[in-house]
Design a protein with these regions (language model features):
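N-terminal "arm"/small-domain region of PLP-dependent enzymes with the aminotransferase-like
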Residues: 1-50, 381-382
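PLP-dependent aminotransferase class I/II
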Residues: 15-16, 56-62, 70-71, 145-159, ...
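Generic structural signal for small/hydrophobic residues in well-ordered secondary structure
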Residues: 41, 64, 82, 98, ...
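Phosphate-binding glycine-rich loop
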Residues: 50-97, 103, 111-114, 121-123, ...
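Helix C-cap/helix->beta junction micro-motif
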Residues: 115, 185-186, 343
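Short beta-strand->loop structural element characteristic of the AMP-binding/adenylate-forming
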Residues: 118-128, 348
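Active-site phosphate-binding strand-loop segment of PLP-dependent enzymes
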Residues: 127-226, 231-233, 238, 380
Length: 388
């Protein structure tokens, strides 16, 4: 068995090196710049509009809005800022609770922490690794009630439960129909952490557009990048106008006066970053096609092994942001991580579960059996587009 696993590990290394046609270090996900990035950056520098006012910021918002078919897209400095603003606009405040998943990147929880809110960790479902509707329904039935005003409250503490925040893990859409039904039943706001899922669709609708708010990320390791950046997607026109206002320091428009009508955030994306984003959006469909081809190759490679490649759920079309595979046991996972990284091929474990981090160790949580199993068995594979 050990010999067989070692053989698979070496075959995987060879497969990945052949795929990327290099003997150099292979990162997990690198950006590709093969279009108008340099030209648009030069244009921005020549214009002197390098901060949050400039034509590329507006153009980037339009491109993302049209691609996702959302009501309004508001560009922010990063995905965490988009989440933070979404929580603020949803009325989440100090002492409130937000239901989310423990299997996520820490930014999900950091955003609600900085609102003064606390996470409630519920298990993932074992197919797409997003927030499980059944586990969420069970937790709510056991621990929540609606008060006379229709506010969802935690029975033991009386704290208001304000929102449900699923994350579309590795780009695979969560089960949104069921989660939306729970939000309606319990008077919760659905905020989609779509940081990883630009180009992913749930039953034909882009992720981040089914909830009241959605948040995208354009970090350097995402499907497209602005260097650093995010986008707050709003379905409602009034929400969109409020999002633009509060992320622009709540400044009231005026030709020369500086007047701010509420505490706001300095979260607007700079024009330099948006210039990158506009160029990247021009190649988004090519990038997505390349990533789906890569995922198909990985699926074919692992088909005859004891490792299970994670495919998109039947109800969705995934961007396959980070390809992932489940190892047969913890020992094989650890060996795979050690061997591949020692030989210059970056394979990484999934994030440590949020309730294991010191700042969230005391958070309320349900049974996290699927999350803990995934943590012990799942690894991510190099996922840079190969033909973009």
């Amino acid at each position: 068995m050990v010999k067989c696993e070692v053989t698979v590990h070496q075959q995987l290394i060879d497969f990945i090196r052949d795929t990327y046609a290099t003997s150099d270090f292979i990162p997990l996900h690198a950006p590709t710049f093969a279009g108008n990035e340099k030209a648009y950056l030069a244009d921005t520098i020549d214009s002197t509009f390098v901060s949050s006012v400039g034509k590329f910021v507006d153009e980037f918002e339009v491109k993302v809005r049209e691609f996702t078919n959302t009501g309004r897209a508001v560009a922010t400095v990063n995905g965490t800022a988009a989440l933070h603003a979404a929580l603020h606009l949803a009325g989440v405040r100090t002492g409130d609770l937000v239901i989310t998943q423990a299997l996520t990147f820490v930014a999900t929880c950091n955003a609600l922490h900085h609102m003064g809110a606390r996470p409630v960790f519920v298990d993932i479902e074992p197919d797409a690794y997003g927030l499980c509707p059944v586990a969420t329904a069970t937790w709510l039935a056991e621990h929540a009630e609606l008060d006379n005003a229709g506010v969802c409250r935690h029975i033991n503490s009386g704290a208001a439960i304000k929102a449900l925040m699923p994350m579309h893990t590795f780009g695979h859409p969560a089960r949104l129909d069921e989660l939306m039904a729970l939000c309606q039943q319990w008077n919760l706001c659905l905020i989609e952490d779509a940081a990883e899922s630009l180009g992913s669709f749930y039953k034909g609708r882009h992720t981040g557009t089914l909830g009241r708010f959605g948040a995208l990320s354009f970090n350097g390791n995402k499907v497209i990048t602005t260097g650093g950046g995010g986008m707050l997607l709003c379905q409602d026109a009034e929400d969109g106008a409020r999002a633009k206002h509060v992320t622009t320091t709540a400044k009231v428009p005026h030709p020369y006066e500086f007047y701010h009508d509420e505490p706001g955030f300095n979260y607007r994306m700079p024009n330099l970053n948006a210039a990158l984003g506009c160029a990247q959006m021009e190649r988004l469909n090519t990038i997505l096609a390349s990533k789906r081809q890569l995922a198909a190759r990985y699926a074919d490679f692992f088909q005859s092994t004891d490792y299970r490649f994670i495919k998109e759920p039947a109800y969705a079309r995934s961007n396959y942001w980070l390809n992932a595979v489940l190892c047969p046991n913890v020992e094989s996972r650890n060996a795979l991580l050690e061997i591949t990284n020692a030989r210059g091929v970056m394979i990484r474990p999934v994030w440590q579960l949020m309730h294991r981090l010191p700042m969230f160790a005391d958070a309320l949580r349900g049974d996290l059996a699927h999350s803990e199993w995934a943590e012990a068995h799942l690894v991510n594979l190099p996922s840079s587009p190969t033909e973009a």
